[in-house]
Amino acid sequence: KCDNAFATYRTDYNIPLGVVKSKYTIVQNNDAFNFFDDAIGKNSAIWQTAGFWGNGERIFVSAKLPNNILVKGDPVENYLVFTNTHDGSGGVKILFTPIRVICKNTLNAAISTSSNYVSFRHTTSVYNKISVAQEILGISKIKYEEFGQYCNLLANIKVTDEDVIQFIGENL
């Protein structure tokens, strides 16, 4: 027994998931689904995948967003991913990504390449922060549309082999 440590566990199997501090606030998996409904709008998200590792220490939920961008006629899909840990090893992370998350590898790729995310620790204010995230993500959706415009501009620029060699030489 530790005075300042507590265990999280799965109530369906009574399996401990991790040791946490007294200020740790649990974010239930159901809250991830509710977040999508609130942030995107009920019936707007197209649910893609949900998964977990181990006994449920880490979970993710992903949804395809309804509006794709087109770059020279090719659709670029956008996904919203909610990931959470239940063992004290991390917090809640919510991100936009063009990567369709279906497993641990694609989740890690999405996290490592995304600059469009919010992250929160499991403190008593985590639910307030998740609410603020909805506003932040609303702004991010606008930025994603702007990103599509920039992609189309870049896709129409002609680049020669010499341009590429010069660029690499100047930037390596």
Describe the function of each predicted region:
Residues 1-35:
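Feature for intrinsically disordered/low-complexity regulatory segments and propeptides
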Residues 30, 34-172:
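Intrinsic disorder/low-complexity polar-acidic segments
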